[in-house]
């Protein structure tokens, strides 16, 4: 199975900060990767598909990039509403696998 190693598991940042989180695939050369945001009690929301494509309606402060088997989600200017858990999903190889998640908190 392809393991998705996500880091950090949690982070705290201030409003306006640039925030990054990463997922590294344990193997595979043509990984198709999505990034999701999940808030407590809510269904996951798709942010980025195909590693770097912004889903319709998602603010442009979110962006995704890829370098080999390393994938990065960046939030360019942190807002209060961004407090959530973020996770990646690879859906190129069965079984599809998720990263462990990054819990993002706002530093007060």
Curated annotation (Swiss-Prot):
GO terms for biological process: adaptive immune response; immune response. SMART domains: IG, IGv. Residues 98-108 are annotated as: Framework-4. Residues 1-23 are annotated as: Framework-1. Disulfide bonds join 23-88. InterPro entries: Ig-like_dom, Ig-like_dom_sf, Ig-like_fold, Ig_sub, Ig_V-set, IgV_Light_Chain. Residues 35-49 are annotated as: Framework-2. Residues 50-56 are annotated as: Complementarity-determining-2. The lineage of its organism: Eukaryota, Metazoa, Chordata, Craniata, Vertebrata. SUPFAM superfamilies: Immunoglobulin. Residues 89-97 are annotated as: Complementarity-determining-3. Residues 24-34 are annotated as: Complementarity-determining-1. This chain was isolated from myeloma proteins that bind beta(2-1)-fructofuranosyl moieties (inulin). GO terms for cellular component: immunoglobulin complex. Residues 57-88 are annotated as: Framework-3. This is Ig kappa chain V-V region J606. Keywords: Adaptive immunity, Disulfide bond, Immunity, Immunoglobulin.
């Amino acid at each position: 199975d392809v393991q998705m190693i996500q880091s950090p598991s949690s982070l705290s940042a201030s409003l306006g900060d640039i925030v990054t989180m990463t997922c590294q695939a344990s193997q595979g050369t043509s990984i198709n990767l999505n990034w999701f945001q999940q808030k407590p009690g809510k269904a996951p929301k798709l942010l980025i598909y195909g590693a770097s494509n912004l889903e319709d309606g998602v603010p442009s402060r979110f962006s995704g990039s890829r370098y080999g088997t390393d994938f990065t989600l960046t939030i360019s200017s942190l807002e209060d509403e961004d407090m959530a858990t973020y996770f990646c999903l690879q859906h190129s190889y069965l079984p599809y696998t998720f990263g462990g998640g990054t819990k993002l908190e706002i530093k007060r």
